[in-house]
Amino acid sequence: MNSSELVTRTIRFQNPERLPYDFPEKYGSDFYSTGLSPSPDDRPRNGGYDEWGAFWQTFGFSNLGEVKEYPLKDWKDFDHLSVPDIHAPQRWQGIEGARERAGDKFILAGGISIYERVHFIRGLENTWMDIYQNPEELGRLVDILVEMNLVAIQKYAAAGADGYIFCDDWGLQNRLMVAPKSWRALWKPRYARIFQAAHAAGLFTFLHSCGYIVDI
């Protein structure tokens, strides 16, 4: 049973010979990771502006950083937001030949967050207020990210990917960041579009989310 079969059987609860694992390359892995590069979800490693116009400051050894200047402070500037071109050919050069390089490993392709990226653009407090005060505008912004994911899914499927993963941290230590009702109204239908498109293209879907998310 090869790596791809192990992962697939694990996802489907079909009694794999062992659990698949994902360690640094020198220790071995059943997964092969790929993704568009540069990604609209990238953060500048040493601080500075990202493709959306958000200004990042990094601290210490971590390259995660935090946004210090948000590009969309006022919804009246929405039409002037710098939106990365998801179709730019250079983004997709890295996935060419991924199937051949991966061998029998399970190819896991990286997507674009539809919550974290929103608050990187608007600010976290603004995003929370938008849920109640500007839901239509907020929905328009989330939809831009959804459409990017739909494009990525087709590109990855054509390149032979097996799974699609992206990250949105929804949880605090003991509760969600937003009310479950609001999450179901604004984000759940949009996640459904992404997952349905991925499944239709033959990809498994994975959503990483830190924190307490039991309520959804």
Q: Where are each of the predicted segments found?
A:
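Active-site loop segments of alpha/beta catalytic cores
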Residues: 1-26, 80-216
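Helix-coil boundary/capping segments in enzymes
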Residues: 17, 27-95, 102
